[in-house]
């Protein structure tokens, strides 16, 4: 069964990442794994569980939590690189509250709750708290899409196909 915890996995890099600060200000049951947060959070530093978590431990954490918070670094947004943890969280059936990223919204228009400011972040939290089963159902509907298009195996197969294509097209280079 799902717990009550909101999760954030990521380093601060000395940057006040808004979704984390808003969650702390709102006294949400946030648990953080990442470096650089204790100094930034002051009295809320008890939210920091550790500066690191093994990748092998993340799925169990995702399966036991209520929701995860996500944001993208500016360069990721500039180039529309979707944070890979979103796929991991959704594959584990975990709802995601994320900043707006056009590429992400194109992939998951309904399965992720999006914010672009503090008010929208609060609306996402209200949606989680008031309509959790509906949000969770939208997340669970994504499993076939994730498995078919975004699994490790699918991505590895695509990379091999790209390499093979270029090797064949450029056989004169060999």
Predicted regions and their residues:
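A charged, aromatic-enriched C-terminal amphipathic alpha-helix characteristic of glycosyltransferases
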Residues: 130-163, 167-171
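Nucleotide-sugar donor-binding catalytic core of glycosyltransferases
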Residues: 1-110
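Conserved acidic donor-binding segment of nucleotide-sugar-dependent glycosyltransferases
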Residues: 112-119, 127-132
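Short, hydrophobic/aromatic alpha-helical segments in well-folded domains
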Residues: 19, 85, 124, 141-142
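Residues in well-ordered alpha-helical elements
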Residues: 56-59, 87, 119, 133, ...
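CheY-like receiver
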Residues: 61, 124-127, 162
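Short, flexible helix/strand-to-coil boundary loops that buttress conserved ligand/catalytic motifs
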Residues: 108, 125, 139
């Amino acid at each position: 069964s799902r717990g009550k915890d909101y999760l954030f996995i990521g380093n601060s890099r000395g940057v006040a990442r808004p979704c984390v600060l808003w969650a702390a200000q709102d006294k949400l049951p946030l648990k953080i794994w990442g470096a650089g947060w204790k100094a930034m959070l002051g009295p809320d530093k008890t939210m920091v569980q550790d500066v690191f978590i093994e990748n092998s431990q993340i799925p169990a954490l995702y399966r036991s939590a209520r929701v995860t918070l996500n944001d993208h670094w500016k360069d990721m947004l500039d180039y529309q690189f979707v944070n890979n943890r979103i796929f991991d969280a959704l594959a584990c059936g975990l709802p995601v509250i994320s900043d707006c990223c056009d590429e992400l919204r194109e992939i998951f228009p309904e399965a992720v709750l999006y914010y672009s400011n503090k008010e929208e972040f609060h609306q996402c939290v209200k949606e989680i708290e008031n309509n959790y089963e509906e949000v969770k159902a939208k997340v669970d509907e994504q499993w076939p899409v994730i498995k078919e298009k975004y699994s490790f195996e699918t991505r590895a197969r695509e990379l091999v196909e790209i390499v093979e294509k270029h090797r064949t097209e450029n056989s004169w280079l060999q």
